[in-house]
């Protein structure tokens, strides 16, 4: 028999009754029932109930063991009586009668419980992550993460993609966040950067003639954490293809990712045909470029119903500024003054003046609008609004007015709030879509200049003609995001593989040809030696896993995450370098000036 085990703690069944076996694992629980000890023995695979009665030679050792001790048990498999069968356990029809117990490792008093799922302070959980990872839900999440990544790898292989590994030590590049810098010992005063993404390398692979690339790529960005983004590092399914249009990228990746979701969705419906929604349409209908399509509320422009109306607040805004629009946020079943007042109070808590609203009820056999707005604009306009929005008695509608560029985010939040309050969102499904036709440029209010809206390596729609002849802010990019349930799960584009177009695009944001050659020299040179049309995308593995396991934040699907202050409490990182290390790198720590 093997030194430590003949079976795992999930393997034994009724067919094994009568066998002498050996198990090893952690003591999950110890219970004393009238002098008979019951030990739940746990390993990575499951739990087996072990019985040690006073007549057993293993009883003396069994009396000493405590929770989370590691032990080896030899014993006889017996069938449980009918009234003690546990149908909730894979091994619930049998129990192991202990004949010998060997203690392999003792455990100190635990700083956090492993049994059950109680809430516990995050700093304790992260400092003792090796214990936290023993908890059932977190352990299961990590296993599922591995399975999801394996499924992605298989799917990409089945599509004819090959996995290539790109460098971790590379040059700094403007991907939209701060770089993690690594000082060079050999080249004093010079630094590598950890890659924010393998963007340039995967494009260089296409120039080198590798047709279909993918990689489970670690990415590093020195940015502030939030629920759907961890500090430090994250992982993405990075993809690139040669000789493709954006439609080719969508039709390749969409079925593969749909299959991954269906495999792990536990029966929840998954969108099979992902709609393509232009960016401008997504902003207008949903107030977001990451719309949650489980929410049935679709916003509409209703400016004409308030133009010249008796509601002077909106009417005067429309008359004084051609950019002003009025958007409607219809809320079916929300037709009560109490609900409308709650929504208005919420808007004020968000720093807004409030939300105009109308709610409809049945009066004398017909549907009539109620509320201050309805009185101000009159019965005819109120009825026209109801007809346009398809509302009935018992429904409501909220209104936001101004420059959409300034209010669309709030309107989107109001749409979400209304749906949450009215319980309109079906949370047991995965709704996917592609957001397409992103702006190529945007105006940077802080720096008062034109900047790239997203990926600077995207191909502008219209090519050189658009760059030379159009208002930069009107140019669209061959760029797209994949969205699931309100989360961006992928971003990609068709790349700009022309050196002339590349220089012209960067000129628009204030960078010269020499700047381009200095910052993106490898890519710029490569494009001068026959670059194929190419494009791709990257799916955020962490967010995909978070959605599939139903976790509330990324720490629940990550092995060893940092805390909100970007610290690894388990490994005590970051930590000071030694004087010798600093000297070898020709570095000196200069304390920052405190205000």
Swiss-Prot record:
- Marked site, Important for tRNA non-discrimination, at 33
Give the catalysed reaction(s), semicolon-separated.
Answer: tRNA(Asx) + L-aspartate + ATP = L-aspartyl-tRNA(Asx) + AMP + diphosphate
The organism sits in which domain of life? Bacteria
- Where does the UniProt entry say this protein principally localizes? cytoplasm
Q: Which GO terms describe its biological process?
A: aspartyl-tRNA aminoacylation
Its GO CC terms?
cytoplasm
Any one GO molecular function term: ATP binding
Keywords associated with the record: Aminoacyl-tRNA synthetase, ATP-binding, Cytoplasm, Ligase, Nucleotide-binding, Protein biosynthesis
Subcellular location per UniProt equals: Cytoplasm
Q: Which Pfam families match?
A: GAD (PF02938), tRNA-synt_2 (PF00152), tRNA_anti-codon (PF01336)
Task: List positions binding ATP.
Answer: 221-223, 488, 540-543
State the residue spans of region: Aspartate: 199-202
The entry marks the following residues as binding L-aspartate, namely 175, 221, 454, 495
| Enzyme Commission number, as recorded | 6.1.1.23
| CDD domains linked to this entry | AspRS_core, EcAspRS_like_N
EC class (word): ligase
**Which InterPro entries has this protein been placed in?**
Aa-tRNA-synt_II (IPR004364), aa-tRNA-synth_II (IPR006195), aa-tRNA-synth_II/BPL/LPL (IPR045864), Asp-tRNA-ligase_1 (IPR004524), Asp-tRNA-ligase_1_N (IPR047089), Asp/Asn-tRNA-synth_IIb (IPR002312), AspRS_core (IPR047090), GAD-like_sf (IPR004115)
Instruction: Write out the function statement from the record.
Output: Aspartyl-tRNA synthetase with relaxed tRNA specificity since it is able to aspartylate not only its cognate tRNA(Asp) but also tRNA(Asn). Reaction proceeds in two steps: L-aspartate is first activated by ATP to form Asp-AMP and then transferred to the acceptor end of tRNA(Asp/Asn).
Classification via PANTHER family: ASPARTATE--TRNA LIGASE, MITOCHONDRIAL, ASPARTYL/LYSYL-TRNA SYNTHETASE
NCBIfam families found in the cross-reference section:
aspS_bact, PRK00476.1
Q: Which family does it belong to?
A: Belongs to the class-II aminoacyl-tRNA synthetase family. Type 1 subfamily.
| Complex and partners | Homodimer.
Instruction: Report what the protein is called.
Output: Aspartate--tRNA(Asp/Asn) ligase
Q: Please name the gene that encodes this protein.
A: aspS
């Amino acid at each position: 028999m093997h030194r430590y085990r003949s079976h795992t703690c999930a393997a034994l069944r009724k067919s094994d009754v009568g066998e002498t076996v050996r198990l090893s694992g952690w003591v999950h629980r110890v219970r004393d029932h009238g002098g008979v000890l019951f030990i739940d023995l746990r390993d990575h695979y499951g739990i087996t109930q072990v019985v040690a009665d006073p007549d057993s030679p293993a009883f003396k050792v069994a009396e000493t063991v405590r929770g989370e001790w590691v032990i080896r048990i030899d014993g006889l498999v017996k069938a449980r009586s009918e009234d003690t069968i546990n149908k909730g356990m894979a091994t619930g029809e049998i129990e192991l009668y202990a004949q010998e117990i060997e203690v392999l490792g003792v455990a100190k008093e635990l700083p956090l419980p492993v049994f059950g799922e109680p809430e516990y302070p995050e700093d304790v959980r992260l400092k003792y992550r090796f214990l936290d990872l023993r908890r059932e839900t977190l352990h299961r999440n990590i296993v599922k993460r591995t399975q999801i990544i394996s499924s992605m790898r298989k799917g990409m292989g089945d599509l004819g993609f090959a996995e290539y590994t790109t460098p971790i030590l590379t040059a700094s590049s403007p991907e939209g966040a701060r770089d993690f810098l690594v000082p060079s010992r050999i080249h004093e005063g010079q630094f590598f950067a950890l890659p924010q993404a393998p963007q340039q390398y995967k494009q260089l692979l296409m120039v080198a003639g590798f047709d279909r690339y993918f990689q489970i790529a670690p990415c590093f960005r020195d940015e502030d954490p939030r629920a759907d983004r961890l500090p430090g590092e994250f992982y993405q399914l990075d993809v690139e293809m040669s000789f493709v249009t954006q439609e080719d990228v969508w039709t390749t990746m969409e079925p593969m990712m749909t299959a991954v979701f269906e495999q792990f969705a536990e029966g929840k419906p998954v969108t099979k045909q992902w709609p393509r929604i232009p960016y401008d349409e997504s902003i207008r209908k949903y107030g977001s470029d990451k719309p949650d399509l489980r929410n049935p509320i679709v916003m509409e422009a209703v400016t004409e119903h308030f133009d010249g109306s008796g509601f002077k607040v909106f009417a005067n805004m429309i008359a004084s500024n051609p950019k002003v629009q009025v958007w409607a946020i219809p809320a079916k079943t929300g037709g009560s003054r109490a609900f409308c007042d709650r929504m208005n109070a919420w808007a004020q808590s968000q720093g807004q003046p409030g939300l105009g609203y109308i709610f409809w009820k049945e009066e004398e056999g017909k549907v009539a609008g109620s509320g201050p707005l309805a009185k101000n604009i009159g019965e005819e306009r109120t009825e026209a609004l109801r007809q346009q929005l398809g509302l009935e008695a018992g429904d409501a509608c909220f209104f936001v007015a101004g420059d959409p560029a300034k209010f669309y985010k709030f309107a989107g939040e109001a749409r979400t709030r209304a749906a949450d309050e009215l319980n309109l969102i079906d949370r047991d499904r995965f709704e996917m879509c592609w957001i397409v036709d992103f702006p190529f440029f945007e105006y940077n209010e802080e720096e008062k200049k034109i900047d790239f809206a997203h990926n600077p390596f995207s191909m502008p729609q219209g090519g050189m003609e658009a760059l030379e002849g159009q208002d930069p802010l009107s140019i669209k990019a061959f760029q797209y995001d994949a969205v699931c349930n309100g989360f961006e799960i992928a971003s990609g584009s068709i790349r700009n593989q022309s050196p002339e177009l590349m220089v012209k695009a960067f000129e628009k944001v204030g960078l010269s040809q020499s700047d381009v050659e200095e910052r993106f020299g490898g890519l710029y040179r490569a494009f001068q030696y026959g670059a194929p049309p190419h494009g791709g995308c990257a799916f955020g593995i962490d967010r995909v896993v978070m959605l599939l396991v139903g976790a509330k934040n990324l720490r629940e699907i990550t092995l060893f995450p940092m805390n909100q202050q970007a610290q690894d409490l388990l490994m005590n990182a970051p930590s000071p370098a030694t004087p010798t290390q600093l000297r070898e790198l020709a570095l000196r720590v200069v304390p920052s000036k405190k205000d």
